[in-house]
Amino acid sequence: MHGIAGVEFSSYIMLNNKKIKLHILGYGFDENNIKMLNLLQEMKEKRVAAHIKLLNFAKMKLLNLPEESLSRINMERYCWFDREFIKCLEQDNYSMDVINYYRDYFKNNRFSYGPDYDLEVQRVIDAIHSADGFVVLAHPMAYKLTRDEVTNIISKLSDLGIDGIEVYQSDC
């Protein structure tokens, strides 16, 4: 057994003048491909910018968070989650009312997962293919779309060149 390169991109596709967020998986690609490396770097920079926006929003608008709380979050990490922000609140002994408010806020608004860093799906497909990778639509039934919308998206993605579709997601 051996490992292969893998990545999940946050991307979007237009469907009936509506921007639909999708996750695209790339497998078995050349990890040294320049086009792929550039797209990964762009996604990282967009994610970091979105996370800074989240922290500034929370710091200025919602709570008087001390700088040392925010400094515990590693903004350069490639993958950063809302739970790290909530962990800072817990470490600073904020009440459960405040912590639960933020859990609900992030869950309902997805502030840190907004369109600030979604990439156009064709760019993602092209980058993975240019690196000799395999392109897969992740969890198609998890997008809270109608069956017809999912069918239309799969058809459109097929025309754009995806290679496969994830068929099982444990929480769907």
Functional labels for PLM-detected ranges:
Residues 1-21, 106-111, 119-172:
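An N-terminally biased module of ancient metal coordination in phosphate/nucleic-acid-related enzymes
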Residues 1-80, 160, 165-172:
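A metal-dependent hydrolase metal-coordination microenvironment
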Residues 42, 46, 116-119, 145:
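Alpha-helix N-cap and loop-to-helix initiation/capping positions
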Residues 51, 77-81, 99-103, 130-133, ...:
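Generic detector of short, locally flexible boundary/turn motifs and exposed helical patches
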Residues 52, 83-87, 122:
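Non-catalytic, well-ordered alpha-helical scaffold segments
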Residues 55-56, 86, 125, 154:
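Short glycine-/small-residue-rich flexible loop motifs, especially phosphate/cofactor-binding loops
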Residues 57-60, 88, 127-130:
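Residue-level signal for well-ordered alpha-helical scaffold segments within enzymatic catalytic domains
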Residues 60-117:
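Hydrophobic, aromatic-enriched interface-forming segments
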